[in-house]
């Protein structure tokens, strides 16, 4: 089995470098890392992408986002040659336990889509933010956990993304959920400044 770890990128720097270093280290030899860059103009990001584009199993292309995440992700999906695609944001990461077990999990679950729990944390968040956005925060500081994300899916033409923002997968018939455990969760840390900027960007796209 081959997994395509697929990433949309635009000017992420420290988080992108950490993610790519991690994926190159822990992916299986037959797996690939597929990157679609929205013409990043940050110099450090361009250096990171240039460096990792020459690594074994890495595929890199550029395409304008044009305010439509679903179309961009569908283009990215079509770049993938794996049996399954695992879509990650450039500011997310998983654990080495996750990478160690994912092939066995997929071999044991003949489903089209796997939902993955996500641990969201926002550095600098206040009670005002939490109330204003209607978030739930547990005793560990995890926001809206398990925040299920449909991210691991069969690479088939009928399974595709829809909606320009807060995009979702359609076309799948069967699905499963990973255990609600930290080792099987997507880790998604942010700062409050990044969260506010992201909210503003999504609002502009939806206008």
Where do the PLM segments sit?
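A short acidic, amphipathic alpha-helical/loop segment
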Residues: 18-22, 47-48, 75, 100-102
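A conserved acidic beta->alpha catalytic loop
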Residues: 22, 33-48, 65, 89-92
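Conserved beta-strand segments of alpha/beta enzyme cores
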Residues: 32, 57-60, 176
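Catalytic-site signature of metal-activated, phosphate-bearing donor transferases
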Residues: 70-77, 84, 93-207
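Conserved donor nucleotide-binding strand/loop of the catalytic core
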Residues: 46-71, 79
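Short, well-formed alpha-helical segments that are part of the catalytic scaffolds
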Residues: 11-26
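Short beta-strand/turn micro-motifs composed of small residues
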Residues: 7-9, 37
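Cell-envelope/extracellular polymer assembly enzymes that use nucleotide-activated donors
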Residues: 2-4
């Amino acid at each position: 089995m081959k997994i395509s770890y697929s990433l949309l990128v635009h000017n992420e720097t420290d988080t992108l470098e950490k993610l790519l270093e991690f994926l190159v280290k822990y992916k299986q030899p037959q797996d690939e890392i597929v990157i679609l860059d929205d013409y990043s103009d940050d110099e450090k990001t361009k250096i990171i992408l240039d460096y990792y584009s020459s690594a074994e199993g890495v595929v890199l292309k550029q395409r304008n986002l044009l305010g439509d995440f679903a179309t961009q992700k569908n283009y990215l999906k079509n770049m993938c040659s794996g049996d399954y695609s695992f879509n990650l944001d450039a500011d997310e990461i998983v654990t080495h336990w996750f990478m160690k077990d994912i092939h066995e999990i997929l071999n044991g679950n003949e489903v089209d889509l796997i939902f993955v729990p996500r641990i969201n944390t926002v550095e600098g968040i206040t009670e005002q933010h939490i109330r204003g956005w209607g978030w739930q925060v547990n005793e560990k500081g995890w926001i809206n956990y398990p925040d299920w994300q449909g991210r691991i899916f069969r690479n088939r033409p009928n399974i595709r993304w829809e909606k320009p923002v807060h995009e979702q997968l359609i076309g799948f018939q069967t699905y499963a959920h990973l255990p609600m455990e930290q080792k099987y969760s997507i880790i998604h840390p942010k700062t409050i400044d990044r969260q506010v900027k992201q909210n503003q960007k999504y609002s502009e796209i939806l206008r």
